Curated annotation (Swiss-Prot):
Keywords: Ribonucleoprotein, Ribosomal protein, RNA-binding, rRNA-binding. GO terms for molecular function: rRNA binding; structural constituent of ribosome. Disulfide bonds: none annotated. GO terms for cellular component: cytoplasm; small ribosomal subunit. This is Small ribosomal subunit protein uS19. Belongs to the universal ribosomal protein uS19 family. It holds the Pfam family Ribosomal_S19. One of its GO terms (biological process) is translation. Protein S19 forms a complex with S13 that binds strongly to the 16S ribosomal RNA. It comes from the Bacteria.
């Protein structure tokens, strides 16, 4: 269920400060964050944000289509290795 419009978008304050500093300096370095729950704002477009997936930081280049989504949607936490082949079926 989406967040109420009267509440506004959620973004962690420490991430917002890092993003504003990167925009102000015109810094191309990735902004490292553990905040997967923060929403992508229009001022983040063009920045590279390194989102933690539980093991490493995945670089995410923010585009206009991503605005309104959460950062965690773009850094998968699970790796799918396919289904194991059935040994009986190979005979």
């Amino acid at each position: 269920m989406p967040r109420s419009l009267k509440k506004g978008p959620f973004i962690d304050l420490h991430l917002l400060k890092k993003v504003e500093a990167a925009v102000e300096k015109n810094d191309r370095k990735p902004v490292k964050t553990w905040s997967r729950r923060s929403m992508i704002l229009p001022q983040m477009v063009g920045l590279t944000i390194a989102v933690h997936n539980g093991r490493q930081h995945v670089p995410v280049l923010v585009s206009e289509d991503m605005v309104g989504h959460k950062l965690g949607e773009f850094a998968a936490t699970r790796t799918y290795r396919g289904h194991v082949a059935d040994k009986k079926g190979k005979r």
